Design a protein with these regions (language model features):
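Surface-exposed beta-strand-to-loop junctions
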Residues: 100-102, 169-172, 236-238, 276-280
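Alpha-helical membrane-targeting segments
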Residues: 168-177, 217-251
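Rossmann-fold NAD(P)H-dependent dehydrogenase/reductase core
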Residues: 1-222, 307-308
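C-terminal amphipathic/interface module of NAD(P)-dependent oxidoreductases
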Residues: 286-309
Length: 309
């Protein structure tokens, strides 16, 4: 077994938990840190994982709180784990029932899906091994060309997204879904920008292998927790039975295995700044290559988090 630590945000349920299971089964890291808001629920989830020789740790991390994110490097220090070789930025929310703000006054979808992960990776840089892998879990919904049925993302500036502002023609649930798809576009921007700023062959400073990944439509996962009763029933009970007939559909188990491969398999250590559908390198959306937007997002996140760009 290779020595090294992997950190999985939201590793206590859904795709995150299946990623933890798959990583433990692969035995490619010596230590796995399940980073989640509720430590007791995280421990209960971890207790269900067959670990083999991999040591599992549960650590508190609330991505909706910048104070919690800032405290996380000290949590890693206290665990005494080896250097981090992989960070899976998986935790995410889709808020449909109106606008919710984080502890820092940031719209919650942006706070958790984008800003929190930006700050986490930046603050962990000096805990990372050379050429550590960083994976941002994105979504095919970021690409209008795929016609997923979700509102198309639009980028008018990260400052507006942080305030919860959106297109005038959207409200209610549609606005919440727009915030989600746009947050997934932002995750691709972050992946490309981290890859550019911390190249894997850099001569000084941290060196990273960064990617964004579309895990596919995983019906039955916890992503629909904010939907109404009927929609949750369809998502959890009906759609999983129809997944094999839906283009781009997957399961949390299959996608978790894909994430584990991207994070630990030597075959995916050769190139940084890629977008994957599953484990297949693929083009991301046309809008995701907009450098002006990527830099605006980076600088805005740095300002909001109080971190040097």
């Amino acid at each position: 077994m290779a020595s090294g630590t992997a950190v999985v945000t939201g590793g206590n349920s859904g795709l995150g938990l299946e990623t933890v299971r798959a990583m433990a089964a692969r035995g490619a890291v010596s230590d796995l840190v399940v980073a989640c808001r509720d430590v007791s629920r995280g421990q209960a989830a971890v207790d269900s994982v067959a670990t083999g020789a991999t040591r599992l740790h549960v650590a508190e991390l609330d991505l909706a709180s910048l104070d919690s994110v800032r405290a996380f490097p000290a949590v890693i220090d206290a665990l005494g784990v080896p250097p981090i070789v992989a960070v899976v930025c998986n935790a995410g929310v889709q808020v449909i029932g109106g606008t919710r703000l984080s502890q820092d006054g940031i719209e919650e979808t942006f706070a958790v899906n984008v800003l929190g992960h930006f700050a986490l990776v930046k603050l962990l840089l000096h805990h990372l091994a050379a050429q550590a892998r960083v994976i941002f879990i994105s979504s095919g919904t970021h690409d209008p060309a795929l016609k997923t049925g979700m509102p198309n993302p639009r980028y008018a500036g990260a400052a507006d997204l942080a305030k919860g502002l959106g297109p005038d023609d959207l409200d209610g649930g549609a606005l919440g879904r727009f915030r989600y798809t746009t947050s997934k576009l932002c995750d691709v921007y972050l992946a490309y920008e981290f890859a550019k700023r911390y190249p894997m062959s850099g001569e000084s400073g941290p060196t990273l292998v960064v990617s964004a990944m579309d895990p596919g439509l995983m019906a039955g996962s916890g992503l629909a927790r904010d939907y109404g009763v009927l929609s949750r029933f369809v998502w959890r009970r009906v759609l999983p039975r129809l997944s094999r007939f839906i283009k781009g559909a997957s399961t949390t188990e299959a996608s978790g295995a894909d994430v584990a491969r991207l994070a630990t398999d030597p075959a995916f250590a050769e190139e940084s700044g890629l977008y994957y559908i599953g484990t297949t390198p693929s083009p991301s959306s046309v809008l995701s290559y907009d450098q002006f937007n990527a830099v605006d997002l980076w600088n805005t996140c740095a300002t909001l988090a109080g971190i040097d760009p």
